[in-house]
């Protein structure tokens, strides 16, 4: 079965519904299966944005036309492969001049609705977080639910010479300091999502970050983003999580339809179709995204 056949199998049960109703549902299903996730990456210079993206994602890289906001450019890159793609947006502002606060706030108000999630990177050995805190509270104060904080370069946590390269893990002393760092970041920012510490260089805790990333993503973005993960990070657990998020998104397409269901369609009929579509979506998920 190819992706087109899989999508057709999801759509087939809709034939028992009135045309206008089935068309409405079909449009949402097609948007769902063709969604291109957009992930924002932000953090001060040296936080390791490129290293983390390379450790997490794969695909043919092509530049996307930059977004201009005042004198600022927001760089965007598309990662493509096997019929699916995602866009990474490099977000400016953190650690730059406060003279441009109004400009940055306008930029983020414009661009944040386009993003499925923002990864905010903070170096493990960065103790000067007042700039990050200011940006969080004054520039991005209305977009907190879309942000996942990541403590990067955990292998550089003191005492850095104790990092266990063979076991790819921190020493007990480093582990304690990493815990204290993530707890400090959480206390300072009070984010919606948990703070995750990783080492992109060694691969330590990247699987934990992927799990947090999938959970933080809107359900409609989880499966297409999963297709761009590095192979070793796309585990059965991650696939299972993405599959459930996808079927949940399919299920919710029917919520608005059912709430305004026209008299020509009995709710029992619509619910039967809904159950069938969701069941088929779960069954053919693998053919859509792999």
Where are the language model's segments positioned?
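Alpha-helical scaffold elements adjacent to nucleotide-binding pockets in ATP/GTP-utilizing enzyme cores
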Residues: 55, 110, 114, 131-138, ...
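Switch II of P-loop NTPase G domains
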Residues: 71-74, 91-141
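Conserved G1/Walker A P-loop phosphate-binding module
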Residues: 1-91, 287-289
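Short glycine-/polar-rich loops that comprise or flank the Walker A/P-loop
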Residues: 84, 113-118, 142-147, 190-194
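P-loop NTP-binding site
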Residues: 210-217, 231-290
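Canonical P-loop GTPase G-domain recognition
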Residues: 155-224
């Amino acid at each position: 079965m190819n992706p087109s056949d899989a999508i057709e199998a999801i759509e087939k049960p809709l034939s028992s519904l009135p045309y206008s109703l089935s068309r409405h549902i079909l449009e949402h299903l097609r948007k769902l299966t063709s969604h291109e996730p957009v992930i924002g990456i932000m953090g001060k210079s040296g936080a390791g944005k490129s290293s983390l993206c390379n450790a997490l994602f794969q695909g043919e890289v092509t530049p996307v036309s930059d977004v201009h906001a005042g004198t600022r450019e927001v760089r965007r890159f598309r990662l493509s492969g096997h019929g699916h793609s995602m866009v990474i947006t490099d977000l400016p502002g953190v650690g730059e001049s406060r003279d441009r606060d109004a400009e940055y706030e306008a930029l983020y108000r414009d661009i944040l609705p386009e993003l499925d999630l923002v990864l905010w990177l903070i170096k493990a050995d960065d103790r000067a977080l007042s700039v990050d805190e200011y940006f969080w509270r004054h520039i991005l104060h209305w977009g907190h639910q879309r942000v996942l904080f990541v403590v990067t370069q955990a292998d550089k946590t003191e005492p850095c010479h104790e990092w266990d390269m063979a076991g790819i893990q921190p020493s007990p002393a480093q582990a304690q300091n990493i815990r204290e760092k993530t707890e400090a970041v959480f206390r300072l920012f009070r984010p919606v999502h948990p703070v995750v510490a990783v080492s992109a260089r060694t691969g330590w805790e990247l699987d934990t970050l992927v799990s947090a990333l999938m959970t933080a993503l809107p359900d409609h973005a989880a499966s297409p983003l999963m297709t761009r993960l590095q192979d070793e990070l796309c585990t059965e657990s991650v696939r299972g999580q993405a599959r459930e998020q996808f079927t949940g998104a399919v299920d919710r397409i029917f919520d608005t339809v059912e709430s305004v269901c026209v008299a020509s369609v009995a709710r029992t009929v619509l619910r039967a179709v809904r159950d069938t579509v969701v069941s088929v979506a779960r069954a053919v998920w693998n053919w859509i995204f792999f």
